[in-house]
Amino acid sequence: MSLARSTALLDEKNTLTSSVTDKYRLAGKITQTCLQHIIQTVLTQYETYTVGEMCRMGDEFLERATTAVYKSVAEKGIAQPVRIEKQEFVGGVSPENGDKFQGGMLAPGDLVKISLGVYIDGYTAQVTQTEVVRHVPNTSAGETEQPLTGSPADAVCASYLASEAVIAYLAQVTDPNPGKAVGVVTGTKIRELVEKIAAAYHVKIVPGSSVRRIRRFLAGQHDIVLERDYKGVLWEVEGEEERALHAVKLAESEAKQESTEGAVCLYEQHIEEEENFTVEAGEAYQVDIQMAAAPQKGAIRLYDFQGYDESGTVINQYGRDFSVTYGLKIQASRKLLSQLEATTSVYPFKLSHVESNVAKARLGLGEILAHQILVPIPVKVAKFVPLAALYEFSKNSKARARDEASKAVPVARNSSSVLLTNDACLRLTGGQAFPPPYVHSAFELPEDVTNLLKLVGHKHGAKVKDVLPGDVDMAPAKEAKMEE
């Protein structure tokens, strides 16, 4: 097939027709419904269930719900297995039954990120919502609910408001008076907006945060799936460290009254080129913002979690790299690969979604991983690295000293899928059904960001319409039904 023909087919499949929009909408509805029930479980039964048990409850619901709809569509299912990540955990926490690490028990004061996603015929809706686990006050004894405060609260506010502000900004392309309020909507301005809010709340943007266009089967699956004509803003570990160090070196030169002419941050040049794109009506976007409670100067790095006793953890999420082929030699590996080809797509998955006997499936995993047919998705934690440690590392490359200086920090995250139709922004996930938790920050939004948020819902401006959760029981004993 020619490049021109394949591009035309890609564009055709991603046109927001009524049929495509309906599939996106249903994926959003299932995702929203599952999220609603998991939040309720997290906040009211955190002493009863482990993180792993709650993740598996959510996965069971998603499997039933997607099986029950669009019976003629083969490509449907879980786009993101349910993850429940507390405090500094930022990825990969979705334990299998029997794993030593079950994500722990939640406790009052924990920041909890709940992530999940669904796809219908390749059209994807994903969500992350941050909640705060609370001690239920004894009202008869005069106790009242108190907000979370301090830097964790700042991170919650910044994450929530940045995601809302970006969605409000994206929605302007659907305004009947385009360009009147904010001008052309670009990737460069998206970055500026998020970074302005992070600075206002004295927090750090966590690497991996992104605002990117999504298309059929292309929803940011850990960069496993190569994408032509990519549009997106991405915060990367090395890049953010380079920017922080560049600022230090500029300050040193200025203090010494040395010329800074020609002092260029290569990463700044890179993002200026990569993010010089225009957002247009007819596109879909995933807005995924993470903020860390780290008010000091420095940067956030992501580390593989090795268990509380440093004995390591079992990876339980994987992605398929379809660009890799290899003639497997071991029978157990060939059998597992055959099962993968029959049951998985381009999205992350758990072995229990492929083979009920996870221990048996893991017997064939080694050879598949060795030849990179599958890409493991490890459990990750976020740590703050002080600027002084980064600076020393830049001079002597001693990673151990840098890592020993790092400190785990709580992270808040908000992620939503949106469709930019010709007359409104259709918010598939998140939105008014999921308000932020009860927190209090001493900081405030800049006035221009507040004004941007006010544009949404204005009678003469852009409209944001939410897909709401359905009324579905998650209990396995009952038949889950959802309208197509």
UniProtKB/Swiss-Prot annotation:
It comes from Yarrowia lipolytica (strain CLIB 122 / E 150). Probable metalloprotease involved in proper assembly of pre-ribosomal particles during the biogenesis of the 60S ribosomal subunit. Accompanies the pre-60S particles to the cytoplasm. GO terms for molecular function: metal ion binding; metallopeptidase activity. The keyword Cytoplasm applies. One of its GO terms (biological process) is proteolysis. InterPro entries: Creatinase/aminopeptidase-like, PA2G4/ARX1, WH-like_DNA-bd_sf. This is Probable metalloprotease ARX1. Component of the nucleoplasmic and cytoplasmic pre-60S ribosomal particles. Its EC number is 3.-.-.-. Keywords: Cytoplasm, Hydrolase, Metal-binding, Metalloprotease, Nucleus, Protease. It is an enzyme of class 3 (hydrolase).
